A protein has these predicted regions:
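Hydrophobic structural packing positions in well-ordered secondary structure
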Residues: 2-5, 24, 78, 121, ...
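ATP/nucleoside-binding phosphotransfer catalytic cores, i.e., glycine-rich phosphate-binding loops
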Residues: 109-110, 115, 140, 150-244
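Short glycine-/acidic-enriched loop or helix-start segments at secondary-structure transitions
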Residues: 7-10, 32-34, 132-133, 160, ...
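N-terminal small/polar loop signature for handling phosphorylated ligands or for N-terminal nucleophile
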Residues: 1-16
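Short acidic/glycine-rich loop or secondary-structure boundary segments that cap or lie
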Residues: 75-78, 115-117, 128-132, 156-159, ...
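Glycine-rich phosphate/pyrophosphate-binding beta-alpha loops
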Residues: 71, 75, 122-135, 202
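Gly/Ser/Thr-rich active-site loops/lids in small-molecule metabolic enzymes
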Residues: 84-91, 137-158
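Catalytic core of DAGKc-family lipid kinases
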Residues: 13-119
């Protein structure tokens, strides 16, 4: 699953003679959803054996590596506390909504310097997380940049209204609440300890960094795969992975 993939990535970064892949037997298997219907090819061990090794970007966050998505804010709190509510995301979400959505954070990087109430920040190298949230649908793990969404302080009612669009990647319709950034570095400071979601794993701290490592890990994929993109004919891009 995604958690095991994250562990493997953390062991493989920096080793040019090592490649990792994803045999999807976990609960979410979010990372490979970016391949659309072709993600089913990852179930075929023979295809993986005959596959191709491609360099993918990773991000470094708080001393750990992530290949997919990291986040800070209410979604990270909901995911971290879900086990306190009998593994119910709904109960965890309701509880955290009543606790309050925004936290006072200072955000720097990608041309932004902001201090104030912040509901959520996601750092995307991949596309899907949390069982199907797709905040930045055209994020690419091989294009040499990270993409970020900063959701500012919003009321509970506004958050409930916007979360559906956030989950579907329609952030451009919410520019009054959400700022989109691109770059290779973002840092967050908080006076209080906050939880950070790193590919589904939780860490805690008062200072959080997201730093790009271009081509940081070799990833094995079935031959001639392309990323899913709903705006292209047939739903798949015509280009292959970027070769480096």
């Amino acid at each position: 699953g995604d958690g095991t993939l994250n562990e493997c990535v953390n062991g493989a970064v920096g080793h040019a003679n090592v490649a990792v892949t994803h045999f999807p037997c976990g609960t979410g298997n979010d990372f490979i959803k970016m391949f659309g219907e072709e993600k089913e090819r990852f179930f075929d061990l023979a295809e993986l054996v005959r596959g191709e090794v491609r360099p993918l970007d990773v991000m470094e966050c708080c001393g750990r590596y992530a290949i997919n998505i990291c986040s800070v804010g209410i979604d990270a709190r909901i995911g971290t506390e879900v086990h306190q509510y009998h593994d119910s995301y709904i109960f965890s979400a309701v509880a955290n909504l009543f606790k309050g959505i925004a936290q006072p954070l200072t955000v720097r990087g990608c041309g932004m310097e902001y201090s104030g109430g912040t509901s959520l920040i996601c750092a995307c190298n991949g596309r899907f997380y949390g069982g199907g949230f797709n905040p930045i649908p055209d994020s690419m793990p091989d294009n040499g940049k990270l993409e970020f969404l900063v959701v500012r302080d919003v009321s509970r009612l506004t958050f409930i209204r916007l979360v559906g669009k956030y989950a579907k990647g329609r952030y451009r319709e919410l520019e009054q609440y959400i700022t989109h950034l691109e770059g290779d570095h973002l840092e967050i400071d908080s006076e209080n300890e906050i939880v950070v979601n790193i590919d589904g794993e939780a860490l805690y701290g008062k200072h959080v960094n997201f730093d790009l490592i271009p081509g940081g890990v070799n990833f094995l994929v079935p031959a001639n795969m392309a990323f899913f993109h709903p705006e292209t004919a047939g739903g798949h891009e015509t280009r292959e992975f970027v070769h480096t």
